[in-house]
């Protein structure tokens, strides 16, 4: 009986720990993550203090923090070819990283690190040099900066059949040397690396290529991690937030359902389907059942996004900054509809798949510069600084914990809905105007449309909508307007 009771207690503790790994540890009502892709640590620290904190963002996903191979031309993907766990990259060193984490935590912005647990660098002719000065010989699986040797890896093989679990989880993803996560030594080094980041104050991890690792191995690693550091404002016994890259289109041998109990999972179907809808390949009226009604993961297990650093570079349905009107409409819907753990993208301009981040003649990443309206220049796109996007971050904060109601559509590509009595969104993706008296569910008054303008000193710089005593307002979105959405909320009442 005692053994049975002990087993039950252990199971309950494990289940509680796993559920805790779905908690992103946001401040207050904040609830949007931004991926500042390839930014330097010092620039992220300043952005937390000067923009993200004041605009109500909740957290930042940062690029991989550990030493990587130096590749000719410095393509972005060199960050995904690690050679040690030393915290020196093109974004900065360990001291700069620690300073950034502290400064961001101090203003309520949590830091989530993109971590590479699946592999080390792929083949390189001869001895390769890393960003922290380490030398390595990937072709022989020699990584003395860790150290790893050939015995710490799975035998080399190529993934030719994506329906073969063995190949997916034990062969080399695009030639990257595949670590054996069942090895005690490998586990110890990965746990040591992640615990060091926790000590520095991070709130959690985006686990790259999670589907290429056995869920049981990841479960062991996650459960062995330290609690978050209370010196950075986390409560006692808080577990790191974990979201895992698992590409699952619904017919995969390795399924997202193997990982969603361990932490959140990147819901790639969300990205693909929202792109299809706002590209006009699927009527917006069908979005009324968005979320689990579309076969997506439960809301609290789904990390949602319009695009990410990988799929924004692919051809297909996925939207990116190069289709700005549709992209902003899709993002407005993403942040207004109550589904998922939301992440927005902040990109740099690219002409091909391998384009490096903005850099100088010495191949050092340059800091973003800003125009008079706060937008980025010099090669950085900074979608998170587009008013239409950061305003919807504020909208999402204002309507937190409310449900969707009063859905309206025209049977095609014009839609609107309320978020309780706190917010209202309308979208027009037709080639003709939306002009309609619609239920906004808001208290009577005049409201600033935060898509077309901002509330400044009690006045709206864009469109405004008068809401009557019954909650109705006249909504107009012209087909030729710069933006195809209109958003009102209680914190934007004039």
Curated annotation (Swiss-Prot):
Gene3D superfamilies listed in its UniProt record: Glycosidases, Golgi alpha-mannosidase II
Reaction catalysis annotation: Endohydrolysis of (1->4)-alpha-D-glucosidic linkages in polysaccharides containing three or more (1->4)-alpha-linked D-glucose units
The set of disulfide-linked cysteines is 48-104, 157-171, 376-382, 418-441, 448-460
Active site feature: 208 (nucleophile), 245 (proton donor)
Q: What is its main location?
A: secreted
This entry's Enzyme Commission designation comes to 3.2.1.1
Keyword Transcription present in the record's keywords: the answer is no
Instruction: Enumerate the cofactors the protein uses.
Output: Ca(2+); chloride
Q: What Pfam families does the record tag this protein with?
A: Alpha-amylase, Alpha-amylase_C
Signal peptide start and end residues: 1-20
UniProtKB keywords: Calcium, Carbohydrate metabolism, Chloride, Disulfide bond, Glycosidase, Hydrolase, Metal-binding, Pyrrolidone carboxylic acid, Secreted, Signal
Which GO CC annotations does the UniProt entry carry?
Answer: extracellular region
Site (Transition state stabilizer): residue numbering on this chain: 310
**Which biological processes are named by the entry's GO terms?**
carbohydrate metabolic process
- Coiled coil ranges: none
Q: What is this protein called?
A: Alpha-amylase-related protein
By which gene is this protein encoded?
A: Amyrel
């Amino acid at each position: 009986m005692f053994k049975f009771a002990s087993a039950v207690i252990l199971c309950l503790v494990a289940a509680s720990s796993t559920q805790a790994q779905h908690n992103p540890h946001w401040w207050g009502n904040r609830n949007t993550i931004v991926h500042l892709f390839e930014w330097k640590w010092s620039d992220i620290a300043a952005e937390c203090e000067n923009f993200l904190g004041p605009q109500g963002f909740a957290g930042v996903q940062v690029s991989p923090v550990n030493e990587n191979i130096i590749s000719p031309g410095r393509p972005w993907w060199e960050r995904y070819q690690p050679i040690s766990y030393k915290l020196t990259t093109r974004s900065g060193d360990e001291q700069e990283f620690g300073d950034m984490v502290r400064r961001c935590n101090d203003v309520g912005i949590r830091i989530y690190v993109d971590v590479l647990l699946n592999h080390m660098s792929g083949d390189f002719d001869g001895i390769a040099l890393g960003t922290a000065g380490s030398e390595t010989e990937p072709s022989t699986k020699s990584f003395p900066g860790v150290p790893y040797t050939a015995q710490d890896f799975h035998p080399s093989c190529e993934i030719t059949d994506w329906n073969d679990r063995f190949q997916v989880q034990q062969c080399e993803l695009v030639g990257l040397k595949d670590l054996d996560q069942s090895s005690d030594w490998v586990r110890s080094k990965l746990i040591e690396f992640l615990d060091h980041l926790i000590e520095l104050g991070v709130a959690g991890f985006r686990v790259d290529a999670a589907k290429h690792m056995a869920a049981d191995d990841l479960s062991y690693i996650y459960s062995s991690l330290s609690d978050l550091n209370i010196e950075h404002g986390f409560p006692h016994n808080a577990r790191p937030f974990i979201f895992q890259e698992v590409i699952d289109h619904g017919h995969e041998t390795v399924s997202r359902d193997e990982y969603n109990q361990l932490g959140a999972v990147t819901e790639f179907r969300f990205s693909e389907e929202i792109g299809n809808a706002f590209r006009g390949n699927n009527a917006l009226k069908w979005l009324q059942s968005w979320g689990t009604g579309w076969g997506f993961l439960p809301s609290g297990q789904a990390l949602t996004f319009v695009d990410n650093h990988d799929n924004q570079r692919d051809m297909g349905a996925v939207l990116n900054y190069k289709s700005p009107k549709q992209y902003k409409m899709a993002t407005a819907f993403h942040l207004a509809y109550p589904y998922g753990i939301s992440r927005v993208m902040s990109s740099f301009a690219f002409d091909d798949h391998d384009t490096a981040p903005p850099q100088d003649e010495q191949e050092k990443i340059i800091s973003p510069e800003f125009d008079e309206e706060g937008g980025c220049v010099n090669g950085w796109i900074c979608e998170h600084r587009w008013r239409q996007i950061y305003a919807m971050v504020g909208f999402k904060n204002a309507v937190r914990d409310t449900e969707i109601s009063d859905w309206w559509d025209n049977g095609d590509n014009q839609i609107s809905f309320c978020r309780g009595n706190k917010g209202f969104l309308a979208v027009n993706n037709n080639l003709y105007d939306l002009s309609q008296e619609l239920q906004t569910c808001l208290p009577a008054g005049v409201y600033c449309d935060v898509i077309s303008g901002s509330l400044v000193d009690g006045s709206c710089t864009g469109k405004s909508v008068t809401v009557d005593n019954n909650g109705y307002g006249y909504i107009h979105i012209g087909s030729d307007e710069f933006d195809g959405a209109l958003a009102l909320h209680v914190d934007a009442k004039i």
